[in-house]
A protein has these predicted regions:
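Short, solvent-exposed loop/turn segments at the edges of secondary structure
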Residues: 48-51, 220, 237-241, 246, ...
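His/Asp/Glu-rich, glycine-adjacent segments
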Residues: 52-194, 199-202, 328-377, 395, ...
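A structural signal for short, well-ordered beta-strand segments and their strand-loop junctions
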Residues: 8, 41-42, 117-123, 174-178, ...
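Metal-dependent active-site segment of extracytoplasmic phospho-/sulfohydrolases and closely related
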Residues: 6, 202-246, 252, 329-332, ...
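Active-site metal-binding loops of divalent metal-dependent hydrolases
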Residues: 10-11, 229-232, 404
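Active-site-proximal N-terminal segment of extracellular/periplasmic enzymes that hydrolyze or transfer
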Residues: 1-37, 47, 465
Length: 502
């Protein structure tokens, strides 16, 4: 029987992970990698906790899942009555976190639904898990609240380790375990700080105990262990409170945690805190976004001028993006504009008056080619993720991307974030992938791990997911020639052999 253990170390930067490995501080992980492999992958956008877990656990991007961000507003139902409409102003950072499962599109299946013999530990995505298979749900709520206020993060990881080792003693085929301490310590102390090093060393000890148990039961060779992260991080030297910025322009603005505002003309939903979605005229229900041409009109926000032009002049803003009346996504920065379109199965980037994504000129490529072509770019894989952001009707009218070193919350960010994430910058989007099985040399997105895990477990891959089968660990282990697994519409039962099409 094959098993899969997906261990997510929240907020772990790949360069920090590699330095600790090279320094000899992670001996158990190092031993695992001698037979396995390690690489870097591009995460989902926005690069923030919970939302960026979706590619791992559904094989779909956040836009496909209909989850545009960790905070969002339902423009179709919000009428400006803050108490009656409070469910239309979503935040997975507080009491609404359990709503995430129901908010995911119904035709998107989690791995917990596809693999019934699953356990989730400290998971914000739990659809498909019974109470018995989500054993840490209460501890996650308690320790998560205490850690946020007290900066006491290690007890959460210790609880995760305890539940993980207990799950390993059972018969679960798939086990997901989220270790939150590295992210918590990164926000307050930095990505390469001593508290992060200590937390990562404790994860290494847990991996050693897990492998020791699997070796003692004769299961280690049939167990796939993946150590991943959902986002990176970068230092924050300046906080631009974006909601307060809109208020300073004379725009009544709704933003968490104060979500009541009389006759609001904007709603600012921050993620990470390096990006934000802005909804224009949120108290007027509608089903469609406003194009950027209308967002520029003074009467849209009631600011007395072109608020988009004023926004991109701010030093903290890398660029903004919105749909255009002429089609596609228009990107605006202080240095010029460009357009992203889809045509004949390719994503096209057309500089107009500038090159806001810093790609050096026009490019047209398939979605798979974009990840390789932009790997070392300032905003890797950005065209793919920008299109995905506007794939869901729940996303804002205007997407605001912060420059590295800046974020968009100040007054209500308690405790202060000295390091952050959530943007499209390389430091936020590139994440480590360590595996007990060899990994491909081709560039990966985190969403591509999903079909590989199902293939290892002998389950068919659902139709219509965004993850591509570029990594087939079971096939490689069995020494077969590289071929693609059959894609089917629903999960069904696991098979002894993965059906292959030639």
């Amino acid at each position: 029987m094959t098993r899969c253990f997906l261990l997510l170390v929240d907020g772990l930067r790949p360069d920090v992970a590699e330095r600790r490995l090279a320094a000899g501080d992670l001996p158990h992980i190092s031993a695992m990698l001698k037979q396995g492999g390690r690489t870097t992958a591009i995460t989902g956008f926005p690069s923030t906790t919970s939302v960026a877990y979706l590619p791992f656990l559904t094989g779909c991007t956040p836009g496909h899942c209909d989850i545009p961000s960790i905070r969002w507003l339902d423009r179709s139902t919000y009428t400006g009555r803050w108490w009656r409409d409070r469910k239309a102003v979503r935040s997975y950072c507080g009491y609404q976190a359990p709503m995430l499962d129901d908010d995911i599109r119904k035709d998107v299946q989690t791995i917990f639904e596809l693999v019934p013999e699953s356990v989730g530990i400290f998971t914000p995505v739990a659809r498909g898990l019974s109470r018995e298979r989500d054993p840490s749900r209460r501890e996650r709520q308690v320790w998560g609240s205490l850690a946020h206020v007290s900066k006491w993060h290690q007890p959460s990881d210790d609880a995760v380790a305890r539940h993980l080792l207990k799950a390993a003693e059972g018969s679960s085929r798939f086990v997901f375990a989220q270790f939150p301490a590295v992210d918590g310590f990164t926000h307050q102390s930095g990505a390469d700080s001593a508290p992060v090093h200590r937390a990562l060393a404790r994860v290494d000890t847990t991996v050693g105990r897990l492998r020791q148990h699997l070796t003692s039961t004769g299961e280690v060779e049939d167990s796939l262990i993946l150590i991943v992260s959902d986002h990176g991080a970068s230092a924050v030297h300046t906080h631009l409170d974006l909601a307060d910025w809109f208020r300073a322009q004379g725009v009544p603005t709704v933003a968490h945690p104060v979500v009541w505002e009389r006759k609001p003309r904007a709603a600012v939903m921050v993620a990470g805190n390096g990006s934000a979605m802005v909804y224009a005229r949120p108290g007027e229900p509608r089903n469609r976004r406003l194009p950027i041409e209308r967002l520029r009109r003074a009467q849209t926000f009631g600011s007395g001028g072109d608020i988009v032009a004023a926004l991109i002049r701010e030093p903290s803003i890398a660029f903004v993006a919105a749909e255009s009346e002429d089609g596609g996504i228009l990107i605006e920065s202080a240095t010029g504009s460009a357009r992203i379109t889809e045509r004949n199965g390719e994503i096209c980037y057309h500089p107009l008056s500038g090159d806001p994504l810093l790609l050096g000129g026009p490019q047209s490529a398939s979605a798979r080619q974009w990840v390789e072509a932009t790997w070392d770019a300032p905003y890797p894989d950005a065209p793919f993720h920008l299109l995905d952001q506007f794939r869901t009707p729940r996303s804002g009218d205007l997407l605001v991307i912060g420059k590295e070193g800046y974020d968009f919350r100040a007054r209500y960010e308690i405790p202060e974030h000295r390091w952050g994430h959530g943007s499209l910058t390389r430091a936020h989007m590139q994440t480590p992938v360590w595996s007990s099985q060899p990994l491909p040399t081709a560039p990966l997105r985190t969403v591509d791990l999903f079909p590989g895990m199902l293939e290892w477990l002998g389950y068919p891959v659902p139709d219509g997911i965004d993850g591509e089968p570029v990594w087939l660990p079971r096939e490689r282990r069995l020494g077969r020639a590289s071929r693609r697994p059959t894609v089917v519409a629903s999960a069904g039962q696991p098979t002894d052999e993965v059906t292959i099409t030639t």
